[in-house]
Amino acid sequence: MNILQAFKMAWRSIIGKKGRSALTILSIFIGIAAVMTIVSVMEGMKAQMMKQFSAMGANRVSVNIYSWMYDADGNDVSKDYFPDLYEYCQGLKEYVIGVTPNGQTNATVIYGTKNSSTMETEYDKQWNLISGPPTLYYGSDQYSACNNLTVAKGRDLAYLDIQNYNQVCVIGAEMAKQFFGTVDPVGKTIKVNGNNFTVVGVYAARGEEGDNSVKQMDNMVVFPYTASRVLGGARFTEYIVKARDSESANTAIAYIGGFLK
């Protein structure tokens, strides 16, 4: 059988079974479209992640410390290692810019008629998250230095906020826009799971106007990590150390490795 005969037989088979052939062709088209959609979504997510990592800045070192200790009654008595790590890093200022816990919590944020629990999550065509409830972070007074953030209004978290368990917070530009509109948020009080927190500052937006890939990163609230005593939701096991440059990062890693031994 030559190629021409094989082609004729295949053609007669297709013509004789038009319905099945149409479904087969449709399935092929659907399969191709699905693959193209998946590839497009994956490429969009990859680009979004790269922009988000870039927005957080370079030379970040992740330090993980795990400690689970319980008393006879089952109460968690694990040691808080951050004060020791914080003090240790103060002696490494030649190499280290800052250090902070890297923790989050889930809570309902309310200001006026705005309520995070009723906010809907929305995505654009590139699957960038463009709206939704704010992400709630815990940090030290050096959180902004570790995450490439600058204060646009008010002030940053202070060391005394941590030490005195002050119920204050700094919010991102997108959170300020969604909850406060044109009103200056600095000095205003938000309720977080029923607890009053005063907004002391607003971080500058990290993305350009209209750039949805990092927009949701600015939909955030940062609390002193000691606020976890009233808000809960955090066992701090990960910490971020921000080095001055790549060479300093290697040196800092060596020193911190010695601290952890």
What are these regions (language model features)?
Residues T24, I28, T37-V41, M49-Q52:
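Juxtamembrane alpha-helical signal-transduction segment immediately C-terminal to a transmembrane helix
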Residues M1-I32:
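N-terminal Sec/SRP start-transfer signal
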Residues G16, A58, A173:
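ATP/adenylate-binding site constellation spanning eukaryotic-like Ser/Thr protein kinases
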Residues L92-F179, V199, M220:
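Short beta-strand boundary microenvironments
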Residues E43, A47-Y123, I130, R235:
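Membrane-proximal extracellular/periplasmic loop immediately following the first transmembrane helix
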Residues F29, S62, E238-I240:
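Short aromatic/hydrophobic contact patches that present stacked aromatics
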Residues Q142-L157, Q167-K261:
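Mid-to-C-terminal secondary-structure elements
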